[in-house]
C-alpha cells in the first residue's frame, strides 16, 4: 500500500535513507522519532519493518502501530496508518477515548472479530527476534481482547509451536497470563534469543524451572550450561536426562546430562519407551547396554522396529564420546551433524543382509 499523501511518501523515503547524527534534528522535526531515537523503515521481502535503537532487529508495521496506540502517540498512529498499517489492529491496545476517536477518524471499525485477533497474534509472533518476542509478551499476555478468542485455537497455536516440550503444562495452565508468559519464554529459549531470555529470567524468577525444561527439550546446550552454572537447580540429573530424551535427536543436551553423571541405561530405556530411536542409538554410543530390558519393553509396546534393532548383537560404545566434556562449545563441535555410530552399524547390517 502506497502512502496516501505526498508528505507521508516523503517521510517514508526519508526513513529509508542513511542520516548522519548531525542531521537527526531533521528526522525529529519530520516526526520520524520514537523513544528518543530516529525511526528507520526497511522492507524484508513483502513486509515493512520499523527499526529504532530500541527495536534494532525491527518490528512489523502493524505491530508498531499497536504499540504507538498503546503509548497514545498520535503522530505515529497517523504516520504508520499512512504508511499502510491496518488501523483496525489499533483496537487491540487502545486505552484512551480520544485515541479511540482518532482511530475512528482514520477508519477503524468498532470491534475486531476473534479471527482477526488470532491472525494478528499469529503474524506478529512469526518474527523471531528478542525485541519482538518481548514486545509480544507486553502486548498480548495481559490483553483482554486475546482472552475473548477461541481458547482451543489459541492453545493449538501454542502447542504446535512448542510441541517438542515434554509437558502439557503450558496448554493446561489455569492462568491465561501465565500460559502466555511461559509461551514467550519458551520461544526465547527455543530460538536462543539471548536478550529475551535475560529479560524473562529477570522478570520471572519463579519460572526458572520452566527455563530449564525448555533448554533440555529444545536441545539448547548453551542455555543449559548457563543455567547449571549460575542457578540453584532443584532437579535430579536423571530427571533432566529424561526430559532431554523425550525429543528425538537431542544429542547435545543428552550428552551434557550424561557428562554430569546421569544414568545412561535409564536414558536408553526411556528413549525406547517413547520410541525415540535416534536417542536410543545415541545412548548406545555413550555406553548404554540395557539391551535385554529395553528389548522386553519394546516387545510389550509392540515396537517391532526397535525389537528388530535390539535383537542384534552388534553394538558398542563410541570411545570419542566417553570423555564427559561439559564445555558447550566443544560439545557443539563434537556433535554437530553427528550420526550415531551404532545407527550406522545397523544400517550397514541391513544393507549387507537385505539388499
Swiss-Prot record:
Protein purpose: Plays a role in virus cell tropism, and may be required for efficient virus replication in macrophages.
Keyword Coiled coil belongs to the record: no
Stated name of the protein: Protein MGF 360-3L
Alphabetical keyword list: ANK repeat
InterPro entries tied to this protein: ASFV_MGF360
Extent of the ANK repeats: 60-92
Biological processes, Gene Ontology terms: taxis
Organism in which the protein naturally occurs: African swine fever virus (isolate Tick/Malawi/Lil 20-1/1983)
Superkingdom as given in the UniProt entry: Viruses
Pfam families (UniProt xref): ASFV_360
Family: Belongs to the asfivirus MGF 360 family.
Tagged with keyword Ligase: no
Transmembrane segments: none
